[in-house]
UniProtKB/Swiss-Prot annotation:
Function: This protein is one of the two subunits of integration host factor, a specific DNA-binding protein that functions in genetic recombination as well as in transcriptional and translational control.
Organism: Bordetella pertussis (strain Tohama I / ATCC BAA-589 / NCTC 13251)
GO cellular component: cytosol
One Pfam family this sequence matches: Bac_DNA_binding
Keyword Transcription: yes
Encoding gene, per UniProt annotation: ihfA
Stretches with biased composition (Pro residues): 104-113
Entry protein name: Integration host factor subunit alpha
Amino acid sequence: MGTTMLAEPRTLTKAELAELLFERVGLNKREAKDIVDTFFEEIRDALARGDSVKLSGFGNFQVRDKPPRPGRNPKTGETIPIAARRVVTFHASQKLKSVVEQPNSPPDPASAE
């Protein structure tokens, strides 16, 4: 039986997003970089304030408080306290989930609007 070689997943970076804005929208490279940076700064700042971020058709980012809890050192078995903390969670939209479930289908250009 033959085996199917799956392509190694790649990582999309902020620099690549800026390059895509430059190519597809016609912004100059400086403007494209500034837009990408500002977009992520606004998301980061909102989450730092404890606000949720909803990106329609993509998903929701939320800040959640995790209470303190007992943990265990795996080497010694000793119980150690884990401090309370805030974490960011992401819940993908149904639209994003269905696109991800079809990894080989090209994205619908209309859904990018």
